[in-house]
């Protein structure tokens, strides 16, 4: 049975089996995109690894196992593939979770997918160019007079890639808020009214996500998070007004 994306204008809703088949198709497409992107990223993994170790300067990480460098090589290739395949993965995800959109509403997918990819890329770039250059020297120099820092490549890559990934995810906040505003879960007034509480939550997120305990690195992450929250309010306002106009609410 061939399944397809159904709109609210169709009389018969999708059955449970059809939903499962639709999910299967979306997952297969996402996995295929990830595999192809990972194979492609293998061509640039060595260069990517060299870029990731730049924040360490002359303090190159060490490999303490015979296969550790090989494992890290393919892990980084997988991460590169995930980044390259992100637009396809996001598109497949959105196409599955919003099958009830009207045809004229589906054009928003053309905006959401590139916007999500752009925000994720901005988050990754911010982590690499702003947070890591400030965090790595601090960690390397902390108690350096009595402790010699010798990081393994596995620990270092886990720190770097984890930070870049989660900051990229955090940068998706405006789109999530805009979607919630579209559903009517939140409103611009609610977001603005709770701005002070949002600052507290942002501070907690920055404290958890920042790899160092110093306030400078925490502030480096808090600033863009506050700006993202303000952008979320603006997007929620635009979406909320469109929603009110479409439903005839005054």
Place the predicted regions along the sequence by residue.
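Membrane topogenic/interface segments and analogous intrinsically disordered interaction regions
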Residues: 1-250
């Amino acid at each position: 049975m061939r399944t397809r994306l159904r709109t609210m204008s169709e009389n018969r809703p999708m059955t449970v089996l059809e939903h499962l088949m639709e999910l299967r198709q979306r997952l297969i497409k996402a996995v295929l995109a990830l595999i192809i992107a990972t194979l492609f990223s293998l061509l640039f993994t060595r260069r990517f690894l060299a870029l990731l170790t730049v924040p360490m300067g002359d303090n190159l990480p060490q490999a303490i196992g015979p296969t550790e460098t090989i494992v890290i090589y393919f892990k980084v290739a997988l991460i590169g593939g995930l980044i390259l395949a992100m637009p396809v993965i996001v598109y497949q995800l959105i196409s599955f979770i919003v099958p009830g959109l009207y045809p004229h509403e589906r054009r928003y997918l053309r905006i959401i997918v590139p916007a999500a990819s752009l925000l994720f890329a901005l988050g990754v770039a911010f982590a690499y160019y702003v947070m890591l250059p400030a965090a790595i020297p601090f960690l390397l120099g902390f108690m350096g007079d009595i402790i010699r820092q010798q990081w393994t490549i596995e620990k270092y890559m886990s720190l770097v890639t984890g930070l870049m990934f989660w900051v990229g995810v955090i940068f998706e906040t405006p789109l999530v808020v805009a979607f919630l505003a579209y559903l009517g879960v939140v409103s611009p007034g609610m977001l603005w009214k709770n701005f002070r509480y949002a600052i507290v939550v942002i501070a907690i997120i920055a404290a958890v996500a920042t790899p160092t305990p110093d306030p400078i690195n925490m502030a480096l992450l808090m600033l863009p998070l506050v700006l993202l929250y303000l952008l979320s309010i603006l997007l929620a306002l635009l979406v909320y007004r469109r929603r009110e106009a479409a439903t005839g609410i005054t």
